[in-house]
Amino acid sequence: MSSETVRLRRPNDGDGYNLHQLVARCQPLDTNSVYCNLLQCSDFADTAIAAENRHGELVGFISGYCPPARPDTLFVWQVAVDASMRGQGLALRMLLALVERAAANGVRYLETTISPDNAASQALFKRAFARLGAGYRTRVLFSRARHFAGRHEDEVLYRAGPLVSVHSREEQLQESA
């Protein structure tokens, strides 16, 4: 099944348990409680996106939120893609769709944290930043020594923006060709 046959949609509270199961299958992602996943799918549905296959199964999910002190910023918390859908561009498709929806609500910046050894996430976000026409900066947000007692890699903050609409960016690229 290709990522084009997957339907992207706003999550709902019926997705919470399935999200918990999806994240558990997506090592090395940290699992949260089912309750946390229910909140991500209900209270934070405007800053999340779900991907389901033709059988209605959850095969991808991105959770995020707008930090209260920075309402013009979408912070992407977690990106999960089922193993059967990896390598088909689904994560990028979900991320760009989520950013487009958030931008319509005033979001101008995109943030996430990525550990230094997570090359796949680094590549995903760098591709997204390029598609969005957004420069980015990085800094260690949570350090292995100070915040994780040596038990977790550093979490490096990536901050991109100001964002250009995905559609506007594609139009700019076509005009310059």
Give the role of each language-model region:
Residues 102-116:
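Conserved GNAT acetyl-CoA-binding A-motif
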Residues 92, 116-138:
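Conserved active-site alpha-helix within GNAT-family acetyltransferase domains
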Residues 78-86, 114-115:
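A short, internal acetyl-CoA/4′-phosphopantetheine-binding micro-motif in the GNAT/acyltransferase core
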Residues 132-177:
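C-terminal "cap" of GNAT-fold acetyltransferases
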Residues 81, 87-100, 123:
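Conserved acetyl-CoA-binding loop-helix of GNAT-fold acetyltransferases
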Residues 6-19:
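A short beta-loop-alpha structural element at the N-terminal edge
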Residues 21-72, 77, 82:
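Acetyl-CoA-dependent GNAT
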